[in-house]
Swiss-Prot record:
One of its GO terms (biological process) is cell wall organization. It comes from Vibrio vulnificus (strain CMCP6). Gene3D superfamilies: 3.40.50.1860. Substrate binds at D13, S14, Y45, G46, N78, T79, T186, H187. Provides the (R)-glutamate required for cell wall biosynthesis. It holds the Pfam family Asp_Glu_race. The gene is murI. This is Glutamate racemase. Pathway: Cell wall biogenesis; peptidoglycan biosynthesis. It comes from the Bacteria. Keywords: Cell shape, Cell wall biogenesis/degradation, Isomerase, Peptidoglycan synthesis. PANTHER family: GLUTAMATE RACEMASE. Belongs to the aspartate/glutamate racemases family.
Amino acid sequence: MESSNQPNVLIFDSGVGGLSVFQEINKRLPEVNYYYLFDNQAYPYGELSQETLLARVEALVVKMTQQFAIDLVVIACNTASTIVLPTLRAKLPIPVVGVVPAIKPASLLANRAVGLIATPATVTRQYTHDLIRDFAHEKEVELLGSTRLVDIAEEKLRGRQVDQQELAMILKPMKHKVDVAVLGCTHFPLLKEEIQQVLGDEIILVDSGEAIARRVQSLLHQLSPQSTKTPWRIFSTAQPWDEAALNGSLKTMGFNAIELYPL
C-alpha cells in the first residue's frame, strides 16, 4: 500500500477537539495523509459573530486546500459546521464533510429522554432546535451548554488531571434525567471516560465521530488521489499554550510538532 497514491485529508477545528474525529477516521483509514489545522487565535468559535467565523474558516481552509493539494475537508466543529458548509461546498471542488450533534441516533436509542451536552452556541442555535424537532420530537430533550467542558478537554490533552468534582458540578443538571446523552461538541469525546464516570454506566453516550469516519471512508473510495505517503502535519493560527505538553500528546497520535499557520 505504501507505493500507491494516498489521499490528503484536512481536518479543521477551532481547537484540539477535532482530534477526536481524527481518531475515528484514522481507525478506518490509517494510510491517509492527515493535515490538522486549528484556529486557536479565534478560539472559542462560539463567541464569534457568524460573519467573522465564516470569513476566517473560508480563508484558512481555501488557502490550505490549495497549498497542500487536499482531497477532502472535514470541518470537525459543530459551531462552524452549522455556518460554513454551504459556502465551502460552493467554493471548493472537493468534498467537505461537517459534523452535527448525533440527535437522530440518540433518539432511536433513548427510552426516556435525550440529553444534549454541547457549547452554549450549539445549544441555542436554530439548527440544533430543528434537529430536535425533526428527529427527537417524541422524546424529552435536556439541553446543557458548557464552555468550561471545552477548556477541560484542552487541558486534558496537555496532560492536566481532570477534576471529577468540577465535572460532576457541570453535568449535575443532566444526571438521573436522561438515558442517552449526546456529546455535541468534538472536544467532548476526549472526556468520554470521565463523563461516563460522572453520569454512570447506565447512560449511553453518543457522538458523531464514527458516522463522520464512515462518510469520509465512503467519499474517499470515489476519489483518485495523486499524493504519495507523507508525515502527518498539524498547524495552529497562533502559538498554542503549553505547546510542549500538547506536542507530547500529538506525537502519540502520529503527528509532527505543531507548525504556525497564521491567517
